[in-house]
From Swiss-Prot:
Pfam families linked to this entry: DUF642
Signal peptide location: 1-22
GO CC field: extracellular region; plant-type cell wall
Gene of this entry: DGR1
The keyword Secreted belongs to this UniProt entry's keyword annotation: yes
Keywords assigned by UniProt, alphabetized: Cell wall, Glycoprotein, Secreted, Signal
Source organism superkingdom: Eukaryota
Cellular localisation: Secreted, Cell wall
Tissues in which the protein is found: Expressed at low levels in roots, seedlings and leaves.
Positions bearing carbohydrate: N124
Lineage start: Eukaryota, Viridiplantae, Streptophyta, Embryophyta, Tracheophyta
Annotated organism of origin: Arabidopsis thaliana (Mouse-ear cress)
UniProt name for this protein: Protein DUF642 L-GALACTONO-1,4-LACTONE-RESPONSIVE GENE 1
Length: 370
């Protein structure tokens, strides 16, 4: 009997230890997600990684370079945005990592990337059963780096995250630099009081690196079947930028959306409405205190209604309230926001920017009034 109890105890300890080892990943950087742990000198030839498992926690395939901040490529100095190391994916090269997740849960991946050659570059990101292509030829940040987000729904308890460079460049070493890969579990948006808009304050969204001052790009809907911004769709050719209070001016709460691509940068949400009933849509329009100056206009659409809210930006923060009252013409109403104009930062970097929207509310009203 004593031996049976001891065997049972050992079995329970073994099971519990496996549970701990396979616990779902927590929000934040993946293991060695910033690539600060690198290959041994014997596993490299110059900057090229020669062994598949040489970068701790990652598997590599193809021409992958381990880049140190300040390393030179021809006459260009390669800059690493966070920490001192990153990886560069050559033609058809990839890196991947397996992690434990909760099946059925929506997750968002955030990563930083930069192109290192003049050619347009794309990056394929995938999990076990989903994939998307992220274009990185347009630069939104003044530092040469941008952070991107991509969402997926976990199909099982373990998934493999893979970054793949599908490009065929003239120079085999050309390819995107990747740094700081993080994950965040997303929760389904809920209604707040009488507000019919879900996640109208944009507080639920992709992981934001605490030290990254350039925000996180959310790709167009055509690039992503699951939105990293719960409740919202990015229905445009360009991305929108997710900004945080720590580095930008945010009208309300801790997060907001910057429309950085003019009319090519739009977000929308479909809400339930009652036919022939009147509704009031209100929202904040401002600037992110990121040097985006000049006259701005945000266009808001709901049903057959439209309003254009102007805002004179000095690039130092601030906002005003916009309002649209409309009559519902169907049981479902699409609410859409876009920027009328294209804007660039005043630092002459050529970086795109735009107006910020926040605190979106939609409530039923008794009758049509201003």
């Amino acid at each position: 009997m004593m031996y049976q109890e001891a065997a049972l105890l050992l079995a329970l300890l073994f099971i519990s230890s496996n549970v701990v080892l396979s616990a779902p990943v927590r929000d934040g950087l993946l293991p060695n997600g910033n690539f600060e742990l690198g290959p041994k000198p014997s596993q490299m030839k110059g900057s090229v990684v020669k062994e598949r498992t040489a970068v701790p926690n990652w598997n590599i395939i193809g021409f992958v370079e381990f880049i140190k901040s300040g390393q030179k490529q021809d006459d260009m100095v390669l800059v690493v945005p966070q920490g001192s190391s990153a990886v560069r994916l050559g033609n058809e090269a990839s890196i991947s990592q397996k992690i434990s997740v909760l099946p059925g849960r929506l997750y968002s991946i955030t990563f930083s990337a930069a192109r290192t050659c003049a050619q347009d570059e794309r990056l394929n990101i995938s999990v076990t059963h989903e994939s998307g292509v992220i274009p990185i030829q347009t630069m939104y940040g003044s530092d040469g780096w941008d952070s991107y987000s991509w969402a997926f729904k976990a199909g099982g308890p373990e998934i493999e995250i893979r970054f793949h460079n599908p490009g065929v460049e003239e120079h085999p070493a050309c390819g995107p630099l990747i740094d700081a890969v993080a994950i965040k579990a997303l929760f389904p948006p809920r209604f707040s009081g009488y507000n019919l808009i879900k996640n109208g304050n944009f507080e639920e969204g992709p992981y934001v690196f605490p030290t990254a001052k350039w925000g996180v790009l959310i790709p167009p809907f055509i690039e992503d079947d699951n939105s990293p911004l719960p409740g919202w769709m990015i229905e445009s050719l360009k991305a929108v930028k997710y900004v945080d209070k720590a580095h930008f001016a945010v009208p309300e709460g801790h997060r907001a959306i910057e429309l950085v691509g003019g009319k090519e940068s739009a977000i929308s949400q479909i809400v339930r409405t009652s036919l022939n009933k009147f509704y009031a849509l209100t929202f904040n329009v401002g600037d992110a205190r990121d040097g985006c100056e000049g006259p701005m206009i945000v266009e808001a659409f709901a049903g057959q209604g439209k309003v254009m809210v102007d805002y004179a930006s000095k690039g130092k923060g601030g906002f005003r309230r916009g309002r649209l009252v409309f009559k519902a013409v169907s049981a479902r109403t699409r609410v859409t926001f876009l920027s009328t104009f294209y804007h660039m930062k005043s630092d002459h970097s050529g970086s795109l920017c735009g107006p910020v929207i926040d605190d979106v509310r939609l409530v039923a009203v008794g009758k049509l009034r201003g």
